[in-house]
Amino acid sequence: MTTKTRFAPSPTGFLHVGGARTALYSWLQARANNGEFVLRIEDTDIERSTQAACDAILEGMNWLGLTWDEGPYYQTKRFDRYNEIIAQMLEKGTAYKCYCSRERIDALRESQAANGEAQKYDGCCRDLPARDTDEPFVVRFKNPIGGSVVFDDHVRGRIEFSNDALDDLIIARTDGVPTYNFCVVVDDWDMGITCVVRGEDHINNTPRQINILKALGAPIPEYAHVSMILGDDGAKLSKRHGAVSVMQYRDDGYLPEALLNYLVRLGWSHGDQEVFSLEEMKQYFKLDDINKAPSAFNTDKLVWLNQHYIKTLDPEYVATHLQWHMDDQKIDTSNGPALAEVVTALAERAKTLKELAASSRYFYEDFADFDAEQAKKHLRGVALEPLQLVQQKLAALTEWTVEAIHLAIEQTATELDVGMGKVGMPLRVAVTGAGQSPGLDITLFLIGRSRSEQRISKAIEFVADRINS
């Protein structure tokens, strides 16, 4: 049997990291077993579902590279199918119309609560004969009486629910709209889903869904209910812990490879290995290796992984993601070095692509002023001679290469009998406007000859004015 999994988010908000991890685990289960992965949008909550949320989910999945083989399917486009099955169930007697009023249901719950009883429907309409009436009704599934529902969860082991603890679930509301728990069952059946990977908050839905599947004569998929993700303070991950939207991590400068690597390790492991390529994830992933204990989100670990991937992935590839941040920060990359060269130069220092973009601005744009603190420290009178001599050395170069630039700076320090810092720091502030950059040779090379010479002249003028003031 072909493995077939699905990711089925509700479009009531963005794709958060918990959902992204579930999608990743489901995707890996399919890919590790040469199976198929389905994307399904569960939009039966019509009032809360939005097109913007749908778009955000698709954008997040595409950015992560979690491609799907089927879909996206939308539940709101399958209402005819759900109603067809409901009609069949009413005909077979596995479902029934319930005419109980809201007032009766509320009174029942109040009475049960007062008596310390579990709050559930009492089956009042379960065995009533059919009515020819215009009274409003819901449709309820006729849940089995007695016995239990047992399933082996890949994460949590054997789970058992008593049928006596389950009431007759509403599968269609008074307006005729089918309910979430019913739509899920029909979808999983129609789409041939063999393994359901989802959050632990769905565990209580599982026995109800299994009973409906049995009533339909449909196969029962395997289940894996993964634990929640906690913040570093032990509370459930929420907005107050920082970014929880997948695309917020994109905006903050993380590579998809870093986020995927981090998410896969939030509950799953393979020995002591920390860094996994997507191919390695597919090779090693097994649902049975997922830990059932909650996992705590650690941003420092994500930053470490992001640094690793910025440094080790192909600079040309990293540059494609960096371009988004350059555009976002309104840096025109057409007037300067190739972005891949900038990635190579700055990768060792960068924690995020957002940070890398900000620190590379001087390669593409002239700055109005020198950093005040750095200028005060390094563009003093003693810097005039080193700047003038290095300017002469650079102007005399027959070729603008990293090696030639390095030699010119080195010769300047040698001729003046000073340490490299006495030349390097004033020169760095001169060409970048600040006090940090990669090696000066690669920095000047990437800035370009004309722009470098203009900036050094500007710094010499700045120092001269300072001497004369």
Swiss-Prot record:
The keyword Ion transport does not apply. It catalyses: tRNA(Glu) + L-glutamate + ATP = L-glutamyl-tRNA(Glu) + AMP + diphosphate. One of its GO terms (molecular function) is zinc ion binding. ATP binds at residue 239. Pfam families: Anticodon_2 (PF19269), tRNA-synt_1c (PF00749). PROSITE patterns: AA_TRNA_LIGASE_I. Its cofactor is Zn(2+). It is found in: Cytoplasm. Zn(2+) binds at residues 98, 100, 125, 127. Binds 1 zinc ion per subunit. Its main location: cytoplasm. One of its GO terms (cellular component) is cytosol. A motif ('KMSKS' region) lies at residues 236-240. Monomer. Catalyzes the attachment of glutamate to tRNA(Glu) in a two-step reaction: glutamate is first activated by ATP to form Glu-AMP and then transferred to the acceptor end of tRNA(Glu). This is Glutamate--tRNA ligase. The lineage of its organism: Bacteria, Pseudomonadati, Pseudomonadota, Gammaproteobacteria, Alteromonadales. The gene is gltX.
